[in-house]
């Protein structure tokens, strides 16, 4: 199987993929140099790219290849893995069950963008353009999109290009569309990134085959039927421990400092290359140095959604980083039930070691109104405080503890490796976050 790998994990994942027997296609110049690879620009069976958090990868491609890659990744790195129930460009017969909603295969309801406005009760052919992942709603359009190695054909007219195709190649491919694909008429064509390496004849042959498929798909079928499978999609998220395993793999290829991938997620570039070259063991100090001034807390859901919370680092006290965050008035504190008034703020305590983050909420006068403990993977310090949410939370109000979101955790428990399952004993002892770190009892104002 052929894999194309891009992003900050490319060296480590290329080493693993080669060990697993995958062929590397369309490698970057740096990867060719590091592994002494022959240049193979044939289309991939599976593509691996960074997730937006830089703490995981999106795996997209032929279903068998995606499954094989992800399972080997589980064995080697032990990440959090979520697989989409539907594929990108699955073509199906759907029934419109509400305004902007279509029922797809297996009763899954997907959102239809407002510009299409299909009639409620109608049945037609749809294509998945964004698969549902976890609780995140998927998106389908009442178009037919058929995808090959080099091109996609669709019932939406126009000529489009992958953003990875340079301008010079776009000129060639646009000319090809005008001179050799004019018979497509009102159909649309999108040139995929692999098209820049393809001979014109190969592109034309594929377009002809896809056109014949599209004509057959337009005939439809029974509601709920999948007429054509697209590309499978999976998300693998790397917590701090998984990144350390990837550091070890990378170290077997090139000099790699401890914490390399965690620091890459902080956005470090040339200075990290220098640490790698010098072999300096400076991860803890570097992470602590970065966690000064303005910081962001990146709360990553297992299915890839990110909640970003901005704050100001108060300081490091022992093994705790304290962050002060202003709260936007008008809402209600989740799990605590107190309305957020103007001037409310949170003190967040982030451990150097541990699997939870403590948020204590305060009035403008400094009176604590409750504490919310998020159970998560071990946080990574820096200007971005990064962790993966394990979906279980504990709220303390008036000395009483409430466990939150257990049902959600049980629904997604299988996506977590065993080592990240929420620990027992999170309810005791009750703690709170103060300006100088963790305290055992919630602080009270003088008037309390």
Swiss-Prot record:
Protein's organism: Pyrobaculum calidifontis (strain DSM 21063 / JCM 11548 / VA1)
The keyword tRNA-binding is annotated on this UniProt entry: no
Identification of the protein by name: Probable ribonuclease FAU-1
Function: Probable RNase involved in rRNA stability through maturation and/or degradation of precursor rRNAs. Binds to RNA in loop regions with AU-rich sequences.
Family per record: Belongs to the FAU-1 family.
Superkingdom in the source lineage: Archaea
HAMAP family assigned to the protein according to its UniProt record, in alphabetical order: RNA_binding_AU_1
Swiss-Prot/TrEMBL keywords: Endonuclease, Hydrolase, Nuclease, RNA-binding, rRNA processing
BP terms from Gene Ontology: rRNA processing
MF terms in GO: mRNA 3'-UTR AU-rich region binding; RNA endonuclease activity, producing 5'-phosphomonoesters
Gene3D superfamilies assigned: FomD-like
InterPro entries: DUF402, FomD-like_sf, Ntdp-like, RNA-bd_FAU-1
Pfam families: DUF402
Documented EC number(s): 3.1.26.-
């Amino acid at each position: 199987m052929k894999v194309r790998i891009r992003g900050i994990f490319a060296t480590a994942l290329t080493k693993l993929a080669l060990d697993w027997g995958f062929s590397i296609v369309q490698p970057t110049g740096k990867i060719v140099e590091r592994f002494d690879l022959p240049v193979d620009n044939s289309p991939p069976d599976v593509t691996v790219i960074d997730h937006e958090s830089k703490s995981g990868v999106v795996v997209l491609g032929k279903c068998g290849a995606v499954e094989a890659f992800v399972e080997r990744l589980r064995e080697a790195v032990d990440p959090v893995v979520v697989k989409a129930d539907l594929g990108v460009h699955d073509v199906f017969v759907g029934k419109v069950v509400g305004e902007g909603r279509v029922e797809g295969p297996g009763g899954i309801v997907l959102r239809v963008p407002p510009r299409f406005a299909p009639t409620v009760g109608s049945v037609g052919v749809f294509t998945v353009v964004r698969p549902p992942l976890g609780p995140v709603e998927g998106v389908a359009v009442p178009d037919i999109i058929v995808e090959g190695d080099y091109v996609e054909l669709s019932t939406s007219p126009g000529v489009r290009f992958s953003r990875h195709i340079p301008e010079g190649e776009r000129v060639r491919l646009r000319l090809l569309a005008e001179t050799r694909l004019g018979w497509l008429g009102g159909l649309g064509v999108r040139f995929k990134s692999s098209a820049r390496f393809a001979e014109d004849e190969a592109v034309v042959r594929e377009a002809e085959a896809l056109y014949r498929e599209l004509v057959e798909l337009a005939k439809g079928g029974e509601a709920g039927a999948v007429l054509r499978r697209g590309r499978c999609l999976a998300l693998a998220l790397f917590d701090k421990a998984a990144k350390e395993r990837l550091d070890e793999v990378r170290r077997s290829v090139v000099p790699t400092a401890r914490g390399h991938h965690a620091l890459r997620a902080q956005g470090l570039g040339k200075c990290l290359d220098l640490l790698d070259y010098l072999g300096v063991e400076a991860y803890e100090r570097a992470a602590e140095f970065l966690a000064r001034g303005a910081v962001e807390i990146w709360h990553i859901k297992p299915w890839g959604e990110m909640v970003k919370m901005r704050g100001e680092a108060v300081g490091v006290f022992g093994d705790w980083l304290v962050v002060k965050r202003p709260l936007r008035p008008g809402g209600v504190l989740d799990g605590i039930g107190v309305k957020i008034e103007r001037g409310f703020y949170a003190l967040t305590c982030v451990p150097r070691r541990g699997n939870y983050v403590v948020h204590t909420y305060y009035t403008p006068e400094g009176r604590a109104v409750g504490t919310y403990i998020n159970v998560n993977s071990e946080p990574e310090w820096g200007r971005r405080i990064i962790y993966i949410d394990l979906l279980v939370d504990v709220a303390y109000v008036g000395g009483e503890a409430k466990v939150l979101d257990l049902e959600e955790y049980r629904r997604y428990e299988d996506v977590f490796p065993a080592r990240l399952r929420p620990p027992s004993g999170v309810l005791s002892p009750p703690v709170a976050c103060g300006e100088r770190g963790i305290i055992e009892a919630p602080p009270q104002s003088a008037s309390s």
